[in-house]
Each structure stands twice: as C-alpha cells, then as structure tokens.
Amino acid sequence: MKFLVWGLGRSGKGALKLLKERGFEVYAGDDSQNPELWREVLGEVDTVVLSPGIPPSHPLWKEALKKEKEVVGELELAYRFFKGKVIAITGTDGKSTTTRLTYLILKKFFDEVFEAGNIGKPFSEVVLENPEGIAVLEVSSFQGKTLKTFRPNIGAFISFSVDHLDWHPSIEDYLKSKYRIFENQTEEDFLILNDLVYEIKKTPSRARKVLFSELYINSDSVFYKDIRLFNPKNLKIRGLHNVYNASVASLIALTLGLKPEDFEEVIYEFRGLPHRLEFLGNFNGVEVYNDSKSTTPHALMHALKTFPDNSVILIVGGKDKGADFYSLRHIVQKKVKIALAIGETKEKIKDSWKDITEVKTCNTLEEAVKLAREVSKLGNVVLFSPACSSFDMFRNYEERGEKFKELVEIWFTRT
C-alpha cells in the first residue's frame, strides 16, 4: 500500500513517522510548502491521510473521493496499529477537561495509560511509543468525520451545540461526524451519553448505555443509580457543567472496575486546565476569570451560569463561525452587567443583545480589558469567555488566553 499524508503539523508528522516505521511507502506535503504535490501523486496512492484542520471542501479531499481513494485522518490511521483499550470522549464543550480528569484517575491505578487526540498529543505518537495499554482520547468532529474502523471500548458523548459550521457543510454533517465515533461499537463496549440532550440521546450504537438521566445530583452528593460518586462541594473546578464532566470521568473509572473511594481524591485535587474558567485572582474585590477555551455560545452559557446575577462584566467575541448569539439573550440578561464585544462578531453580538444589557464594542482585547478595569466595582466578576474561535486575532485559544492574562497583569495589578 502507498499513502499520501497531507498536512505536516504535529499530527501529520506523527502519521508520517508511524507509516515509515511500519515500512510503507509514503508521500507527504501540505498547502504551505508544496501545494501542488498531491496532484502529481494522488493517482499512485491507495490511502490519503488528512490532518484534522483540512476541511471537506479542500480540493484534495474532493479529488480523492472522486478517484475512489480511501480518505482517513491521523486518529483512524493510528487506531489501526493500536492493540490496547481505547476510551473516546467527545462533545462540543467539556471534552478536554473530561479527558484530562479521566487520564489522571486511570494513570493512578493502571500501568501504561496515555492521553492523546485532540487534546494535544497525536495518537500516532502514542502508538509509536507503546501500541498497547489504555489510550484516553479526546476526539473532535474533524477527527470523527474521517473514522472508518475506529471502535472505542468506552465512549462518552457529553455535550452538543451547533459549532464549526465554517468547516462542516451543515449541522447534520457535524452531528454525523460525532456519531461516527461510536458506530462500530458492539454489545461488549460501553457508551456514556448525555441523554438530556436530544441529539445525543439518539446516538446510534450497539454498546451498553450509561445515561446522564441515571445520575442524581444534590448539594453534597452525586449518585449513579445507588452508587455515590463524589461530593460536588469538594470540586475545585467551578460550574454544574464541571460536575457532569467529573461524573463522566467517574463513570469511566467505574466501568473499568474502580470504586469511588479509590479515585475521589483525584477528582478533588484537579484544578482544571488552563483557559477553562481559570481563576486569575481577586483584585480589590473584583474576581477575574480566563475562559479563552470558550469557543461556542454553549460554552459561554455554562460559564455565565457559574456566577451571581447581574455581576458579570463580560469580554466576548472573536471569529464568526455562524454562531447564534440571540439564543443567549435570557442568560445574558440575567447575568451580564455590561458586555464588551471584540473581534469579527462584535457588531453581531451588539445587535443581538443591545436591548437587554449594555454592550460596548472594542477594537482590541487590550481595549476591552482596560475598559473592564474602569467599569468594574466591588463584587463584580470580569469574565473573558469569547464564545468564538480565535483565528481572527490570534493563532489559537491558548495564545488568546495568555494575552488576556498578560493584560490582566498590566491593567488589574499595576493600576
């Protein structure tokens, strides 16, 4: 077999190395270095391996399908060489937090546990290091679209809202890409579903289902059926959405034979990932949070629910992915004292909310942070939760979040 790997970021390089080490003949390139190479070699290869960021509208993808070439992603490729257990976690929001917490629990009790996928480390790098063990994978819709034989032993579909319509041709395609992650599961496998969401509830899978509706949550306990999982008061990660994220990690651990008393301390010690409702400090009675990972209105909604009514000075906006900000009117009216809108979506946000709360548009993130400092008062919360991707102003959400932290350091601690 001959392969073409297209896209030479970290996942593409991992796929290339894996194929070469397994003795396959491989062509490789990307749009920035040799954009026409694929046209020269496509006829010679059997399989095209695409990096996650390459959309279905790309001419290589279209031409490969036209020529009846197999099109897969790096995750599917790596899976074909992996011999261990696979845990696959997906959702519009919360999947990184849940993946990391699951990984932290399992690595305490099992040898050879790996975290990979959309969270940062390509699965192919794991397979090169050790093709066995337990792989805890965060799986995006981009990765889901190119899966073929992938079959997780344990799956989790934890949240869904409209997203990535700049990449997927439709909502249906986005959802179908999520479903594909679980479609090869059998009765021997498990699938944890947030069945409180209609689109997730109807996920097609033959796996044994573990459902959110079977969870019971009160002020000091989370139960799955009659099993007490943990005390939500002891969590360091804020918000009801994080109670559910911790519940999913707990349910995965239960499925693998662990008991709550074994792993609850790991849950209580977990402080969350950077840029996810990250507490930056209390500055003269004003709390500041960095939620740069918020790339959807759904994520913003969960963040706002965490704070008292009419307390939030919200910095919001970024690249326009076709998001619906009008749908947030109820929670914005209840929680937001003033919204400071930035990026491509600033006028769209203003038009959606201007009759329910004060909205000011800012040309830069620095302008917004400076204004937030000026208008904030004792008891207020300054929340940076963009509800958009970062690509209009920054390379990624990490760079955006780090810039926000730098600006908070300047305007909140030095003034």
UniProtKB/Swiss-Prot annotation:
Pathway as given in its UniProt record: Cell wall biogenesis; peptidoglycan biosynthesis
Compartment(s) of residence: Cytoplasm
Disulfide cross-links: none
Top EC category: ligase
GO cellular component: cytoplasm
Any one GO molecular-function label of the UniProt entry: UDP-N-acetylmuramoylalanine-D-glutamate ligase activity
This protein's UniProt keywords: ATP-binding, Cell cycle, Cell division, Cell shape, Cell wall biogenesis/degradation, Cytoplasm, Ligase, Nucleotide-binding, Peptidoglycan synthesis
Keyword Cell division tagged: yes
The keyword Methyltransferase appears for this protein: no
EC numbers on record: 6.3.2.9
Positions contributing to ATP binding: 91-97
GO biological process: cell division; cell wall organization; peptidoglycan biosynthetic process; regulation of cell shape
Main location: cytoplasm
Pfam families in UniProt: Mur_ligase_C (PF02875), Mur_ligase_M (PF08245)
Catalytic activity: UDP-N-acetyl-alpha-D-muramoyl-L-alanine + D-glutamate + ATP = UDP-N-acetyl-alpha-D-muramoyl-L-alanyl-D-glutamate + ADP + phosphate + H(+)
Family according to the record: Belongs to the MurCDEF family.
Function description: Cell wall formation. Catalyzes the addition of glutamate to the nucleotide precursor UDP-N-acetylmuramoyl-L-alanine (UMA).
NCBIfam families with a match to the protein in the record: murD
HAMAP family per record: MurD
Protein name: UDP-N-acetylmuramoylalanine--D-glutamate ligase
Taxonomic lineage of the native organism: Bacteria, Pseudomonadati, Aquificota, Aquificia, Aquificales
